[in-house]
């Protein structure tokens, strides 16, 4: 690979890893397995090591985790809360042990081995024996204050009474949800018409970040694994664990002190075969140098300690038979194929289904009915098919062909965008889409009508009582009372929930409409700039992409939604029902107002020494500025590099718009 190819690949991988980092740490909605993420990160690290001058300033290899959330107060860590370097290779564990001996010549080194629980790292701060704060890892230097939420976890002690307590100390651990409680939670969600959560880690992260301090925190548990204090003599990690146990913190009893590499490898091998017997998900083993002075000598990198490493188990991959494929219809009309498999025991659970994602995946795998397929469960509830054993394929086997018509309403499918995604275009008449839209509309993050679950929605649709979300607001007592199983109290609960939803703020209503690509965060961002539905409905694509973090795809999706007369009619009914379709002016005091480029708009023309144009656009957006594509009276600045478009320069001069160069925009960006 030459240097130009490396530059492009580093840029691509940096953006890709940052994207998946955000999904994992900030949104708790990962799209790929840990193993796939680690492989991407390893590729980026290898390229950056080969071409160190091409490493980007925002490289995820130089930072930990994700940004703290704006929803919670930020707390700076007294000691950096670094992540661990990890490996899937036994050889690299051996190299780690050899490096430790090389850097500590002649020393006797003990290694402390612990299981790596698949949860969320948290820090507990105690003062005078009382729990003062609980903070997430965040970016390693600062995290979110989740104290009130964490206090709901039963085995986090809020007061410790012991004569040997120091004035202040910090305990670190892993919050998690047991496999049994995770299954109970998902059964509960399904009973209320909610989508099941993907895995226990997602459930834990989402629960800890729920703004309400009440709720299902008692589903959570916590294992503690670290003690920090300037007021204590802590010569070894083993002593730290002993103090935690003495103070009645919840410590996993699965740790082991090892004196040789052979003992370390035996510990790894034992738990690889025994991990499915545990009540909680693990994804590997953590190996630490036990002695604190030796840890200090080995030191830290910017991202991780040199005295510890995480060995991660590869996802299990087993073979079974593909029996059939069916097709599910989502609320936006997306058709998702699901493979039905001959049941097999994988990672401690019986697996009968696997996701196939889209038509492209079926084609890539060259699937035939009756194939012997390899499945992998990398922490997700629905595993995926990773390959096919073609040598075992029957000569008369039938290839899997993606459906051409909607399985719910029979409408011919259409392919949209460049992705291998097929949609049912019958947005108003497809019963599965309506079910999905209504489930989304009543969700707690949208209109929060918790008294309406999946079964109620199905009955309302089957009775012809509801054809759009707006029809919920015209339901009468007798309409609901006539549904199977509904008595007076349940009926009144539904009506009360519908009435209460009229007070949900504008950003929640916008999210509830189910506009493609407009999630909870994007809805909030849009309504900070467009504070009522009428103004938003008249916004152009160019107007919308001027909003930080709003790209072309989202902007087109929003404008397309408001160009549809049926959607405008729906909004009129929601207005008449009394929903909040505007945001109070006070709410426009949003986070970007204190950023250096807040409220300013820019057009970029030409090439630049320090940036690609897309990089410059993202920097401007992150500093609060907006990006326009054309010169207009709305523009504040035209940024000109080498060989700018002469037409744009002339147009800017004619309108009296300021032109600035690369040095000036760097000053404005405060870089």
Swiss-Prot record:
InterPro entries cross-referenced by the UniProt entry: BRCT_dom (IPR001357), BRCT_dom_sf (IPR036420), DisA/LigA_HHH (IPR041663), DNA_ligase (IPR001679), DNA_ligase_AS (IPR018239), DNA_ligase_CS (IPR033136), DNAligase_adenylation (IPR013839), DNAligase_N (IPR013840)
* Cystine crosslinks: none
Report if keyword Manganese is assigned: yes
**What Pfam families does the annotation carry?**
BRCT, DNA_ligase_aden, DNA_ligase_OB, DNA_ligase_ZBD, HHH_2, Nlig-Ia
Entry keyword annotation includes Calcium: no
Enumerate the active-site residues: 116 (n6-amp-lysine intermediate)
GO-annotated cellular components: cytosol
Q: What class of enzyme is it?
A: ligase
Domain BRCT, chain residue ranges per copy: 592-671
Catalytic activity, EC: 6.5.1.2
Reported cofactor(s):
Mg(2+); Mn(2+)
What does the record give under GO molecular function?
A: DNA ligase (NAD+) activity; metal ion binding
UniProt function note: DNA ligase that catalyzes the formation of phosphodiester linkages between 5'-phosphoryl and 3'-hydroxyl groups in double-stranded DNA using NAD as a coenzyme and as the energy source for the reaction. It is essential for DNA replication and repair of damaged DNA.
Query: What is stated as this protein's family in its record?
Result: Belongs to the NAD-dependent DNA ligase family. LigA subfamily.
Put simply, this protein is called: DNA ligase
Classification from the root reads: Bacteria, Pseudomonadati, Bacteroidota, Cytophagia, Cytophagales
């Amino acid at each position: 690979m030459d240097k130009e190819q490396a530059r492009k690949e580093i840029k691509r991988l940096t953006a890709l890893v940052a994207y998946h980092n955000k999904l994992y740490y900030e949104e708790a909605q990962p799209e790929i397995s840990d193993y796939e993420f680690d492989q991407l990160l390893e590729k980026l690290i290898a390229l950056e090591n080969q071409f160190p001058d091409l490493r980007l300033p925002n490289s995820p290899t130089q930072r930990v985790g994700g940004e703290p959330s704006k929803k919670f107060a930020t707390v700076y860590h007294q000691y950096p809360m670094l992540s661990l370097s990890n490996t899937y290779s036994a050889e690299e564990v051996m190299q780690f042990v050899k490096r430790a001996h090389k850097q500590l010549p002649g020393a006797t080194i003990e290694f402390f081995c612990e299981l790596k629980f698949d949860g969320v790292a948290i820090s507990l701060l105690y003062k005078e024996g009382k729990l003062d704060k609980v903070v997430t890892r965040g970016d390693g230097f600062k995290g979110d204050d989740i104290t009130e939420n964490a206090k709901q976890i039963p085995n986090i002690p809020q007061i410790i009474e012991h004569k040997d307590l120091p004035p202040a100390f910090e305990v670190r651990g892993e919050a998690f949800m047991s496999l049994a409680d995770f299954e109970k939670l998902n059964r509960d969600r399904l009973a209320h018409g909610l989508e099941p959560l993907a895995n226990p880690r997602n459930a834990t992260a989402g629960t800890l970040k729920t703004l309400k301090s009440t709720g299902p925190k008692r589903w959570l548990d916590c294992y503690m694994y670290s003690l920090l204090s300037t007021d204590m003599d802590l010569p070894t990690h083993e002593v730290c664990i002993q103090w935690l146990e003495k103070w009645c913190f919840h410590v996993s009893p699965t740790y082991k002190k090892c004196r040789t590499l052979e003992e370390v490898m035996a510990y790894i091998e034992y738990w690889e075969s025994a991990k499915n017997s545990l009540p909680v998900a693990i994804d590997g083993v953590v190996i630490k140098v036990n002695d604190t002075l030796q840890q200090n000598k080995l030191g830290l990198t910017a991202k991780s300690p040199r005295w510890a490493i995480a060995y991660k188990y590869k996802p299990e991959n087993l073979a079974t038979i593909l029996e059939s494929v069916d097709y599910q219809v989502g609320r936006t009309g997306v058709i998702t194929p699901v493979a039905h498999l001959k049941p097999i025991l994988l990672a401690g659970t019986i697996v009968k289904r696997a996701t196939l994602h889209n038509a492209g995946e079926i084609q890539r795998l060259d699937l035939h009915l009756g194939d012997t397929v390899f499945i992998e469960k990398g922490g997700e509830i629905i595993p995926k098919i990773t390959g096919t054993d073609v040598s075992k394929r029957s000569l008369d086997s039938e290839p899997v062909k993606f459906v051409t018509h909607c399985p719910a309403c029979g409408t011919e499918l259409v392919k949209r965008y460049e992705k291998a995604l097929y949609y049912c275009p019958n947005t108003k008449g497809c019963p599965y889409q309506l079910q999905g839209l209504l489930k989304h509309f009543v969700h707690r993050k949208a209109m929060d009508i918790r008294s309406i679950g999946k079964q109620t929605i199905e009955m309302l649709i089957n009775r012809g009582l509801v054809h759009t979300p707006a029809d919920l607001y015209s339901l009468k007592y007798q309409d609901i009372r006539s549904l199977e199983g509904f008595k007076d109290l349940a009926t009144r609960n539904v009506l009360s929930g519908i009435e209460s939803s009229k007070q949900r703020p504008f950003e929640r209503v916008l999210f509830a409409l189910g506009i493609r690509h407009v999630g909870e965060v994007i809805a909030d961002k849009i309504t900070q700039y467009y504070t009522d539905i009428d103004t938003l409905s008249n916004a152009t694509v160019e107007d919308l992409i001027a909003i930080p973090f709003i790209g072309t795809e989202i902007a087109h999706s929003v404008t397309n939604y408001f160009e549809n007369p049926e959607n405008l009619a729906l909004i009129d009914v929601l207005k008449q029902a009394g929903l909040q379709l505007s945001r109070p002016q006070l709410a426009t005091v949003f986070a970007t107002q204190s950023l250096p480029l807040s409220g300013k708009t820019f057009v970029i023309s030409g090439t630049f020494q320090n940036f690609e144009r897309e990089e410059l656009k993202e920097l401007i957006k992150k500093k609060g500025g907006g990006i326009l594509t054309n010169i207009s009276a709305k523009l504040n600045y035209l940024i000109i590099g080498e060989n700018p478009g002469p037409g744009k320069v002339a147009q800017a001069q004619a309108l009296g718009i300021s032109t600035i160069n690369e040095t000036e925009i760097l000053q404005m960006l405060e870089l």
